[in-house]
């Protein structure tokens, strides 16, 4: 399983360039976990694929002020759908390993827990199969290709429409974002 790695963002980049670097690192993390997630032999591959998608979706939200509205509208939906397709497999894995397993240790031989384990394993197998299907569908391949190409074609909205965000340095853009987030938690 491949965990998130540095996106290579540096202070000389514009906010849009930083978004591209982050988005490409997310796509690469997703692709590096794809074969393992499809095989279904280690649930960590699905987990790391979901981490990549979650990071990408967060980047889309954070960098929205410097992205074209149509770009966000189109791709946010597709990444959400893919995340949902993988979610059930991860949820069942977590339930079986982190919730049910401690109960089985506390109550060894409990017949109800054995039934729950058997049903949970069945659900996990079905969910893993659905995740594998999602990653082998043509629509997934098309999403990767279209999104990667669109990353290099996306243009920021007009400066007036975005409140000058694309004209900011990455440092000032980040400071503005952090300021907004800080106000949300006050």
Indicate residue ranges for each PLM-predicted region.
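Cationic, histidine-enriched alpha-helical/coil surfaces that engage anionic ligands
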Residues: 1-186
